[in-house]
């Protein structure tokens, strides 16, 4: 599995879950005797992360790196991947990372995945092409095309809304920008509120080609319903800055990804 730009953008740009209902960064209250250290789930649990369709594990690894940089030490990242070679690669990558004790990879289909855990953060770069564009490589077909055993974003929305995303948790995914209208309509039908939309364009003169969308569950009182999401733009390249360099990354893209690229 190659490391694509979509995965890098999602892993770097997605909003990390709040520490409100989890162990605070580096357990900052651990030595504060005035802080009531309850053993209740709402105070003591760590952050639960799900990378749905994790491929080689790059997004989960980036999330772990960012959590560590933010001071979190209590978290678990579960990668679910239907493709056996990719799952094996993810296992190797997880095991070789400095945070190997926080990872596990399950070689199963998301369609049959029924965890008892609810997640604070669900992240995914899901399949999005329809079957009319199937490539000859069956593994690539499963990773990038809906239909069959593929777990596309409609299924991901349903999964998150079916008790697998905690109240206050975040579902983050990246899709072709053309899916925006359908995505928002489907999400609303499952009671998911669009909290943030990052429109990604390759150059300043082009329309956005990718969308990072983040969702939360609507509250029981309906307070989240109807709130306008935060909208942002990211431009990847600007050839006008350095005409002789075909990879003229913008400052904003370099700032976003500098901690991940070698």
What do these predicted ranges mean?
Residues 12-21, 32, 36-117, 121-124, ...:
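Conserved SAM/SAH cofactor-binding pocket of Class I
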Residues 1-21, 25, 47-48, 54-65, ...:
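SAM-dependent Rossmann-like transferase core, predominantly class I methyltransferases
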Residues 28-29:
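Low-complexity, intrinsically disordered or signal/transmembrane-proximal segments
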Residues 3, 9, 149-208, 213:
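Conserved Class I SAM-dependent methyltransferase catalytic core
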Residues 126-159:
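Mobile active-site "lid"/loop adjacent to the S-adenosyl-L-methionine
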Residues 207-262:
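SAM/dcSAM-binding transferase cores
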């Amino acid at each position: 599995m190659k490391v694509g730009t979509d995965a890098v953008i999602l892993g770097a740009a997605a909003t990390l879950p709040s520490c409100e209902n989890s162990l605070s960064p580096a357990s900052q209250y651990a030595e504060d005797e005035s802080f009531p250290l309850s053993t209740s789930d709402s105070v003591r649990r760590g952050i639960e992360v799900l990378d749905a369709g994790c491929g080689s594990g790059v997004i989960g690894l980036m999330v772990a790196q960012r959590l560590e940089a933010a001071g979190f030490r209590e978290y678990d990242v579960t990668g679910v991947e239907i493709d056996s070679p990719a799952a094996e690669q993810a296992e190797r990558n997880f095991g070789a990372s400095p945070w190997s004790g926080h990872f596990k990879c399950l070689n199963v289909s998301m369609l049959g995945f029924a965890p008892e855990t609810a997640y604070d953060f669900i992240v995914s770069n899901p399949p999005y092409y329809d079957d009319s564009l199937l490539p000859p490589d069956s593994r690539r077909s499963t990773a990038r095309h809906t239909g069959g055993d593929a777990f596309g974003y409609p299924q991901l929305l349903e999964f998150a809304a079916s008790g697998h995303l905690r109240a206050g948790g975040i579902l983050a995914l990246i899709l072709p920008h053309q899916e925006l209208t359908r995505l928002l309509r489907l999400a609303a039908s499952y009671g998911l509120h669009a909290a943030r939309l990052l429109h990604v364009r390759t150059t300043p003169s082009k329309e956005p080609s990718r969308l990072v969308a983040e969702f939360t569950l609507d509250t029981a009182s309906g307070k989240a319903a109807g709130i306008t999401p935060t909208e942002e733009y990211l431009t990847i390249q600007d050839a006008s800055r350095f005409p002789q360099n075909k990879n003229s990354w913008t400052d904003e893209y370099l700032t976003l990804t500098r901690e991940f690229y070698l």
